Swiss-Prot record:
UniProt family annotation: Belongs to the ferredoxin--NADP reductase type 1 family.
Designated gene of the protein: fpr
EC number: 1.18.1.2, 1.19.1.1
Pfam name, any one: NAD_binding_1
Single biological process term from Gene Ontology: cellular response to oxidative stress
Entry GO MF terms: ferredoxin-NADP+ reductase activity; nucleotide binding
Entry GO terms, CC: cytoplasm
Official protein name in the record: Flavodoxin/ferredoxin--NADP reductase
Residue ranges of every copy of the FAD-binding FR-type domain listed in the record: 2-105
Organism: Buchnera aphidicola subsp. Acyrthosiphon pisum (strain APS)
Residues holding FAD: 54-57, 70, 78-80, 120, 251-252
Binding site for NADP(+): 147-148, 177-178, 188, 218-220, 224
Function text: Transports electrons between flavodoxin or ferredoxin and NADPH.
Known cofactor(s): FAD
Length: 252
């Protein structure tokens, strides 16, 4: 059984006209960093009231008191627009138990752990790195966040704090695809890998001998990057029953 329970909305942080974070308090069961949950609200149709539900990942570490969920407001998206218009004191539904295996304990030992995210896919990595459990077995972690515009790097201040916390183990790299910015690489992740721009910039190469790659976010990025690594770097999908080099989570 995994019932719906009430979550209290403590705050709605609106970063841009389409990006926002919900700060919630709810008596959910303990979860693992990197997992996701489901949020729901009733639709506004009085003649046919149904719960609209979607899956969203946590940004916060499991040890934190409140939950933080990073969300993109989708054009004509039923739930995301309802969530965007919530206020402190409102209530929403959340599942008692969390879901998913995009967690650090599922990642095999390796020298270099690559964390690739697009958009709100940065959330699970923030949760994992804030929690910090089972991280010492990696010599280097490369956290890469790709967005369209520089102002969409909502959690860059947190990423910089985490870089300081890990004292040389963690490198962060930002990417913008629709504008050029002096502090970010320009392009899309598959393009920057195909041309070895990203690897040259961070000073490490992706290969099956030293690396494990985590992919989270836009399913087109996930698919294209996976196929590039499979076809050009001899890397395979990681499964519980068969050890590989790539762990993936699609965001829609």
């Amino acid at each position: 059984m995994n019932p719906w329970i009430n979550a209290d909305v403590l705050m709605v942080k609106k970063w841009t006209k389409n990006l926002f974070s919900l700060i919630l308090n709810a008596p959910i069961e303990p979860f693992f960093a990197g997992q996701f949950n489901k949020l729901a609200l009733y639709n506004s149709n009085p003649l046919n009231k149904n719960k609209i539900q979607r899956a969203y990942s946590y940004v916060n570490a499991p040890s934190e008191k409140n939950l933080e969920i990073y969300i993109v407001r989708v054009l004509n998206g039923q739930l995301s627009n309802l969530l965007y218009n919530l206020h402190s004191g409102d209530k929403i539904f959340i599942k008692k138990k969390s879901f998913g295996f995009f967690i650090i304990d599922e990642i095999p030992d390796c020298e270099i752990l690559w964390m690739f995210a697009t958009g709100t896919g940065i959330g699970p990595y923030c949760s994992i790195l804030q929690e910090g459990k089972n991280i010492n077995r990696f010599n280097h972690i490369i956290l890469t966040h790709a967005v369209r515009y520089q102002n969409e790097l909502t959690y860059l201040p947190l990423m910089k704090e985490l870089r300081q916390k890990y004292n040389g183990k963690l490198q962060i790299q930002t990417i913008t695809s629709r504008e050029k910015h002096k502090n970010s690489l320009n392009g899309r992740i598959p393009f920057l890998l195909r041309n070895k721009i990203l690897e040259k910039h961070v000073g490490f190469s992706i290969n099956p001998q030293t690396s494990h790659v985590m992919l989270c976010g836009n399913p087109f990025m996930v698919k294209d990057t996976f196929l590039f690594l499979k076809n050009n770097r001899n890397m395979e999908k990681h499964l519980r029953r068969k050890k590989g080099h790539i762990t993936m989570e699609n965001y829609w």
